[in-house]
Amino acid sequence: VKDPEKLLRIAKEWGVETEGKDIYDLAHEMSDLAQEEYGKIRGYSRWLKRAPQHTQDLWHAAGIEPRAIDREVSCALHMTHMGNTSKPEALIRQALRNGLSDGWGGSMMGTEFSDVLFGTPKPIDTEANLGVMVAENVNIVVHGHDPSLSEMICEYADSKEMIDYAKSMGAKGITVSGVCCTSNEVAMRRGIPMAGNFLQQENVVLTGACEAIVVDVQCIFPALG
């Protein structure tokens, strides 16, 4: 837990008692509540209360308040299956509800708890270019959308054990750079340089400079397989 203050703020926002609790016990409790937000059967998304009151009132009047993140996706899939919902008003309402569950649910959840786990970003100097890879170093490029994997790679690549191992193999050190959204994650938290954007992921390999490009779950060109 890199940002315990933010965890405490979210807990207070969600009405969770924090007094006297170990920060990691609280983190596990909040994790359980956060996962319930994906499939709970009662109530509405906890994050909606962050919106201005007049916006909340508009959502309520229109009947588009998202209930749970995965629930709205499943509902939309069901409604658009053959022989189900045919009224355009109902389909549009569910589309709006589903969109809100994405932005005010899944996206906000991922952002807030990534900050809790890995630290809240702050302005930081970094570089962006294919030239950030260093010929004399072991070059590892992280790519994708899951910050958990890239954070662990950065953590271990910076360890004395791994740097000494790289040097024993003839390199001067280890350079971690990034591509696509994972690149932005490690750039804004660690200052890791950006080798390129989504469209440049194959170019990173074509340089011949990187020893490994590590991908996770999304935005991966088939050629990288």
Where do the model's predicted regions map?
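Metallocofactor- and cofactor-centric catalytic cores in central/energy metabolism, strongly enriched
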Residues: 1-225
